[in-house]
């Protein structure tokens, strides 16, 4: 075997252990256990579009391709996306109102994932923990920065709605010192986040990595598209 072959030979990688999980899925599956139970029971978590998202009947038409309308009025929706324990995270009610529910949700789920893995967040302060979050729709940002509603813009609008903060707020709040990346590769975003987390662990860049994804649709436009 020549030197070139030796260089090109792939070295075996240390297996990556998944030690904790946190989640939110339609059908009130708010933990790994409830999600597994839902799958085993064959529960259909698809429901009518909630009224607090949009009036589905106003946009419904069986005529596929009709501009401004959609041939569906159902989907997979999370419950209580407006609820957030701001006091727990030391965030004022005023600032919390500007924060994208996707950011709020990620803070809660990260805490739950660490607990699920038997990790104490205080013990991870300053650690080389990487955060990799897949994203897609950023509608809360569009809603606040609308030309028609500039009065909604406030002192926390940027940090509350920018996509990069989906990962950065986690790293900042928990004081993680590893890489902090929010990425968008459409439907593969969460999978790519896991891939990058593994690469970070294998390279020695991170000692611990959090990988996940979030996508909350507030308005009908993305479904229309």
Q: Which ranges hold each PLM region?
A:
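Cys-dependent condensing catalytic cores that perform Claisen condensation/acyl-transfer
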Residues: 5-225
């Amino acid at each position: 075997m020549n030197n070139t072959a030796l260089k090109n030979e792939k070295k075996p990688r240390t297996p990556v252990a998944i030690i904790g999980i946190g989640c939110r899925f339609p059908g009130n599956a708010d933990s790994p256990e409830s999600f597994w139970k839902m799958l085993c029971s064959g529960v259909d978590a698809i429901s009518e579009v909630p009224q607090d998202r949009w009036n589905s009947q106003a946009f419904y038409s069986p005529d596929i391709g009709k501009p401004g309308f959609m041939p569906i009025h159902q989907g997979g929706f999370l419950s209580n996306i407006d609820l957030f324990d701001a006091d727990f995270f030391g965030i004022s009610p005023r600032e919390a109102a500007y924060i994208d529910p996707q950011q709020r949700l990620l803070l809660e789920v990260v805490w739950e994932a660490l607990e699920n893995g038997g990790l104490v967040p205080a013990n991870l302060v300053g650690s080389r923990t990487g955060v990799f979050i897949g994203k897609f729709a950023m509608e809360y940002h569009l809603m606040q920065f609308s030309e028609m509603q500039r009065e909604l813009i406030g002192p926390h609008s940027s940090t509350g709605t920018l996509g990069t903060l989906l990962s950065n707020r986690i790293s900042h709040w928990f004081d993680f010192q590893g890489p902090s990346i929010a990425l968008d590769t459409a439907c593969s975003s969460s999978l790519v986040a896991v891939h990058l987390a593994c690469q970070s662990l294998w390279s020695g860049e991170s000692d611990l990595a959090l990988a996940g994804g979030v996508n909350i649709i507030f308005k009908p436009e993305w479904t229309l598209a």
